Amino acid sequence: MMGAMSKNMESMPDMAMMDMSVLQACMDACAACEQACTVCSTQMMDCAPACMNCADMCHTMMRSMLRMQGMTPASMMAMLDACIAMCQMCMDECMEHADMSEVCRLCAQACQACTDACTAVKDMMMASA
């Protein structure tokens, strides 16, 4: 089932070549990662800075995907790379505490899912270029 965001995005002329399900999955993963990182940042002081930065990056990535008109492929790739890097850093930090904290384990899982979703969008963009 296509969400309202996907329907709106599909109506944009620049989006005709994009697979809306891949974009929707990435936005969903970014939102889930943002939430998991926000929760983790309030629970574990050791990884709080990484979690807060990752939450901000995921939020920014999701918002950028909602307004892709005017965004060049190069800038979109740079945003995806930045989101992947932030998620990887946060995941690595949270994995150090994952055996002691369920919150950190769940945050690391959300970071991995977001990394995978951003990579899928990059792959789709490269295939359609």
PLM features: residue spans?
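Amphipathic alpha-helical hairpins
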Residues: 1-129
